[in-house]
Regions:
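Amphipathic alpha-helical scaffolding segments comprising HEAT/armadillo-like alpha-solenoid repeats
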Residues: 19-31, 53-65, 87-96
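Solenoid-like repeat scaffolds
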Residues: 1-2, 29-36, 63-70, 96-103
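Ampipathic, surface-exposed secondary-structure segments
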Residues: 35-68
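Structural detector for internal amphipathic alpha-helices that build alpha-solenoid repeat scaffolds
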Residues: 5-18, 41-51, 72-84, 106-115
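Alpha-helix initiation and capping sites
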Residues: 3-7, 17-25, 34-38
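Eukaryotic acidic, Ser/Thr-rich intrinsically disordered low-complexity regions
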Residues: 87-116
Length: 116
């Protein structure tokens, strides 16, 4: 598959969700190579989270880590916070940070002046 920025791979995942689970590592590796901004790795993480957070937990974890590293301008990370952690994530930041390294990394990226 030819993919310049991750969109084609994201679309493939969305259109073949029932049959691409065995290829997920390859698909994520491809997105890691071509998605320079994190837009599509974060979109894929959000999509898989909405489909079945438990079933796709490993893939979601990898995609989130890639998104944290790639979204330097913080354009896409914020969209995940409420979906993944609930509307009250800011009030529970200390608790969530202690339990989830990805949360801590995203929160620090979004709110660098935070005392956390």
């Amino acid at each position: 598959m030819s993919d310049a920025d991750g969109l084609a791979t994201y679309e493939y995942i969305a259109n073949h969700i029932g049959s691409c689970e065995e290829d997920m590592d390859f698909l994520i590796d491809n997105m890691a190579r071509v998605d320079l901004t994190g837009q599509f790795v974060i979109s894929a993480a959000r999509y898989l989270f909405a489909i079945d957070n438990g079933r796709f937990a490993d893939a979601i974890g990898r995609l989130v880590q890639l998104g944290i590293d790639k979204d330097r301008e913080r354009r896409y990370l914020g969209a995940m916070m409420e979906q993944f952690y609930g509307a009250d994530y800011a009030a529970r930041a200390d608790e969530l940070s202690a339990a989830d390294d990805n949360f801590r990394r995203i929160y620090k990226r979004l709110f660098p002046a935070s005392a956390m």
